[in-house]
């Protein structure tokens, strides 16, 4: 029987994919040491057990627009996260997106997946990969992923889109098309919730140039889910992130000093407020601090779409929100500079 160290050694000749480590680890009650979190991060020790957090659930079909705006604004100020139901994206579009993503990870040969892998050492985020950024002490998340942009057309590079399954492109383009209307409504509500005109926040964010970056997270079964994390605690760099998970529990939010599981609602859209909306709002809306746990027996997957500025776009507090009594809390800077500072853990 292989030891955890043996598993690591087996994979030293290539980039170690978590999916491969998981299949080698199946018969063991341990995992390689680089996946074992420090005690103050381990889910078993830090999760408030027996309580599932009911984050605000908002009906996007509510005929009372003022009520809906208030609910979205309040959730964004107090929680930084909410779930949308009756959002207008058909269940079939979500099912198709999830079906082709699952097929890519579970049925496409590994050699074919590696054809669209990120180049090691490249600054390009798109492609199939494993670790997104260097963590302190060399720790790793129990997750493989695929990144590619789905909108606008000028930003899309099909080199990073899987050719198999054959319906992958159609399913992702349809989901991206359906999502744009939802994005417009969220931005309008966030804008009105700050006392601005409905169009002002999305215009400050870049309007039609906002980039939709899709990520598929694949968290295989983990022999020690009590010790590992799928994704370490963080806030998103995006304006907002819109996510659909599969049915396996995993998303946790930090609130009132505790980590809580977030209740799964089938086909709801989970919306995270990201760093850039916190900046645009001058701190009125809060970027949500969250992480992902893993499961011993089941594969968890999620499909976040990060709504981001183009790299050269400057983001800062919206001037209309500023006054002597409310000076800017954030610097205005190009998004690429913000990303560089955050990934390298430099002050903003």
UniProtKB/Swiss-Prot annotation:
Catalyzed chemical reaction(s): a (2R,3R)-dihydroflavonol + 2-oxoglutarate + O2 = a flavonol + succinate + CO2 + H2O; a (2S)-flavan-4-one + 2-oxoglutarate + O2 = a (2R,3R)-dihydroflavonol + succinate + CO2
Any one Pfam family match given in the protein's UniProt record, by short name: 2OG-FeII_Oxy
UniProt-recorded name of the protein: Flavonol synthase/flavanone 3-hydroxylase
Pathway where it operates: Secondary metabolite biosynthesis; flavonoid biosynthesis
UniProt binding sites for Fe cation: 234, 236, 290
PANTHER family: OXOGLUTARATE/IRON-DEPENDENT DIOXYGENASE (PTHR47991)
Job of this protein: Catalyzes the formation of flavonols from dihydroflavonols. It can act on dihydrokaempferol to produce kaempferol, on dihydroquercetin to produce quercitin and on dihydromyricetin to produce myricetin.
S-S bridge residues: none
Family statement: Belongs to the iron/ascorbate-dependent oxidoreductase family.
GO-annotated molecular function: flavanone 3-dioxygenase activity; flavonol synthase activity; L-ascorbic acid binding; metal ion binding
Compartments where located: Cytoplasm
Keywords: Cytoplasm, Dioxygenase, Flavonoid biosynthesis, Iron, Metal-binding, Oxidoreductase, Vitamin C
Domain Fe2OG dioxygenase span(s) in chain numbering: 209-309
Catalytic activity, EC: 1.14.11.9, 1.14.20.6
Cofactor(s) annotated in UniProt: L-ascorbate; Fe cation
Cellular component aspect of the GO annotation: cytoplasm
Organism: Petunia hybrida (Petunia)
Main localization category: cytoplasm
Cited InterPro entries: DIOX_N, IPNS-like_FE2OG_OXY, IPNS-like_sf, Oxoglu/Fe-dep_dioxygenase_dom, Plant_2OG-oxidoreductases
Cofactor binding note: Binds 1 ascorbate molecule per subunit. Binds 1 Fe cation per subunit.
